[in-house]
A protein has these predicted regions:
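Rhodanese-like catalytic fold shared by cysteine-dependent sulfurtransferases
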Residues: 1-21, 27-59, 65-100
Length: 100
Protein backbone atom coordinates (compact mmCIF):
# COMPACT_ATOMS: atom_id res chain seq x y z
CA UNK A 1 0.00 0.00 0.00
CA UNK A 2 1.00 3.60 0.34
CA UNK A 3 0.55 6.72 2.39
CA UNK A 4 -1.17 9.95 1.40
CA UNK A 5 -1.09 13.47 2.79
CA UNK A 6 -4.38 15.32 3.14
CA UNK A 7 -5.42 18.86 4.00
CA UNK A 8 -7.31 19.32 7.30
CA UNK A 9 -10.43 20.42 5.38
CA UNK A 10 -10.57 16.95 3.75
CA UNK A 11 -10.64 14.91 6.97
CA UNK A 12 -14.42 14.51 7.12
CA UNK A 13 -14.59 13.34 3.50
CA UNK A 14 -11.83 10.77 4.01
CA UNK A 15 -13.44 9.53 7.22
CA UNK A 16 -16.77 9.09 5.45
CA UNK A 17 -15.53 7.68 2.14
CA UNK A 18 -12.79 5.41 3.43
CA UNK A 19 -14.12 4.61 6.93
CA UNK A 20 -10.66 5.23 8.34
CA UNK A 21 -9.54 4.66 11.89
CA UNK A 22 -8.41 8.06 13.19
CA UNK A 23 -5.29 7.77 15.35
CA UNK A 24 -3.76 10.58 17.38
CA UNK A 25 -0.12 9.58 17.81
CA UNK A 26 0.78 12.34 20.28
CA UNK A 27 1.46 11.87 23.99
CA UNK A 28 -1.63 11.34 26.18
CA UNK A 29 -1.43 14.82 27.76
CA UNK A 30 -1.53 16.44 24.30
CA UNK A 31 -4.44 14.19 23.30
CA UNK A 32 -6.40 15.31 26.38
CA UNK A 33 -5.99 18.99 25.44
CA UNK A 34 -7.47 18.48 21.97
CA UNK A 35 -8.25 15.54 19.72
CA UNK A 36 -10.35 14.95 16.66
CA UNK A 37 -13.77 13.51 17.60
CA UNK A 38 -13.61 9.73 17.56
CA UNK A 39 -9.80 9.58 17.45
CA UNK A 40 -7.99 7.01 19.55
CA UNK A 41 -4.70 7.84 21.23
CA UNK A 42 -1.86 5.45 20.37
CA UNK A 43 1.39 7.36 20.95
CA UNK A 44 4.03 6.80 18.28
CA UNK A 45 6.96 4.57 19.09
CA UNK A 46 9.87 3.85 16.78
CA UNK A 47 9.95 0.17 17.72
CA UNK A 48 8.52 -2.44 15.39
CA UNK A 49 5.75 -3.53 17.76
CA UNK A 50 3.98 -0.18 17.25
CA UNK A 51 2.92 -1.22 13.73
CA UNK A 52 1.37 -4.42 15.06
CA UNK A 53 -1.34 -2.47 16.86
CA UNK A 54 -3.20 -1.86 13.60
CA UNK A 55 -5.14 -3.98 11.14
CA UNK A 56 -4.13 -3.83 7.49
CA UNK A 57 -7.79 -4.24 6.55
CA UNK A 58 -8.86 -0.77 7.67
CA UNK A 59 -7.28 2.47 6.40
CA UNK A 60 -5.66 4.71 9.00
CA UNK A 61 -5.63 8.47 9.38
CA UNK A 62 -2.72 9.58 11.57
CA UNK A 63 -1.95 12.96 13.04
CA UNK A 64 0.55 14.44 15.48
CA UNK A 65 1.03 18.04 16.67
CA UNK A 66 2.51 19.59 13.50
CA UNK A 67 2.52 16.74 10.97
CA UNK A 68 6.17 15.67 10.96
CA UNK A 69 5.98 12.65 13.27
CA UNK A 70 2.78 11.40 11.64
CA UNK A 71 4.50 11.66 8.25
CA UNK A 72 7.34 9.43 9.50
CA UNK A 73 4.84 6.97 10.97
CA UNK A 74 2.76 6.97 7.76
CA UNK A 75 5.85 6.20 5.67
CA UNK A 76 6.74 3.33 7.97
CA UNK A 77 3.22 1.87 7.91
CA UNK A 78 2.92 2.40 4.15
CA UNK A 79 6.07 0.32 3.61
CA UNK A 80 4.51 -2.40 5.75
CA UNK A 81 1.45 -2.57 3.49
CA UNK A 82 -1.02 -0.30 5.28
CA UNK A 83 -3.23 2.30 3.61
CA UNK A 84 -2.42 5.45 5.57
CA UNK A 85 -3.43 9.10 5.44
CA UNK A 86 -1.65 11.85 7.36
CA UNK A 87 -2.83 15.40 7.98
CA UNK A 88 -0.67 18.24 6.67
CA UNK A 89 0.10 20.49 9.63
CA UNK A 90 -1.23 17.99 12.20
CA UNK A 91 -3.48 18.85 15.12
CA UNK A 92 -2.34 22.46 14.99
CA UNK A 93 -3.71 22.87 11.44
CA UNK A 94 -6.84 20.89 12.32
CA UNK A 95 -7.66 23.31 15.13
CA UNK A 96 -6.97 26.27 12.86
CA UNK A 97 -9.34 24.83 10.25
CA UNK A 98 -12.10 24.54 12.89
CA UNK A 99 -11.72 28.23 13.76
CA UNK A 100 -12.50 29.27 10.17
Amino acid sequence: MAFYTIHPRDIQNICFQKRVRVVDIRKPQEYRKYHYPGAVNIPYSDDDSWCCRFSKYRPLLLYCEYGSTSLLAARKLGKEGYEVYTVIGGANAMQEQLRR
